[in-house]
Amino acid sequence: MPSLHVFYGGTFDPVHVGHLAIARAAHAALQAPIALIPSADPPHRPTPGSSSMDRLRMLQLAVSKEPGLSADPRELQRAARQNRSSYTVDTLTEVRSELGPKTSIIWLLGADAFVNLSNWKDWQMLPALTHLVIANRPGITLQTQLPPKMATVFNHRWVQDPATLRNTPHGHLWLLNQPPNPSSASKVRAAISAAAHWEADLTPEVAQYIRTHRLYGIHDIN
């Protein structure tokens, strides 16, 4: 069976149970290991609420007991080495160079990120580098929320059978249907700063890391 390399990019600020649910579902559906790649400070989004090293460490803790999942620090390392902004297209160009032109590569992302893909650097180049697997997210309807310029690039690329992704190196889209999880990083951060209940959205190891390192305003809690 041809090999398949799956990368799940995100800010993971912090990584929560919704992220893990998507990664587990992709691992089961695609029968391939999932490498989660935390971004450096993303140029198209606000600066993360914790440092890149904190986000990487939380991600490592979250996947440490998850078969088939791993944390890949390549994007943080490249941003630190080159002292410049981090872009997904650069990561995928690097991965494609490493794995060669015939290897099947998948970039996994949530539907909420996908509908804003046209804000990413050189987003039109992505089909030449990778397949895209889009995980459904609460409140996102791709048929109605996809900008016209994205629809022109992507609408003819959808496939129904994920086996197509393994048998071709790049260029297709597939929708990962899994039970939507309402967890979000912004909700977790807001709950922490408001001294509300937040631990249920995180693994115990990540929750303890946040307490220990006083992240997201938790030091303001009495």
From Swiss-Prot:
EC number assigned by the record: 2.7.7.18
InterPro entries for this protein: Cyt_trans-like, NadD/NMNAT, Rossmann-like_a/b/a_fold
Keywords: ATP-binding, NAD, Nucleotide-binding, Nucleotidyltransferase, Pyridine nucleotide biosynthesis, Transferase
Class in the EC hierarchy, top level: transferase
Highest taxon listed in the record's lineage: Bacteria
Pathway: Cofactor biosynthesis; NAD(+) biosynthesis; deamido-NAD(+) from nicotinate D-ribonucleotide: step 1/1
Any one GO BP annotation for this protein: NAD biosynthetic process
Alphabetical list of PANTHER family matching this protein: NICOTINATE-NUCLEOTIDE ADENYLYLTRANSFERASE-RELATED, PHOSPHOPANTETHEINE ADENYLYLTRANSFERASE
Function: Catalyzes the reversible adenylation of nicotinate mononucleotide (NaMN) to nicotinic acid adenine dinucleotide (NaAD).
Cited HAMAP family: NaMN_adenylyltr (MF_00244)
Family to which this protein belongs: Belongs to the NadD family.
Protein name in the entry: Probable nicotinate-nucleotide adenylyltransferase
Organism: Xylella fastidiosa (strain 9a5c)
Lineage, opening ranks: Bacteria, Pseudomonadati, Pseudomonadota, Gammaproteobacteria, Lysobacterales
Gene: nadD
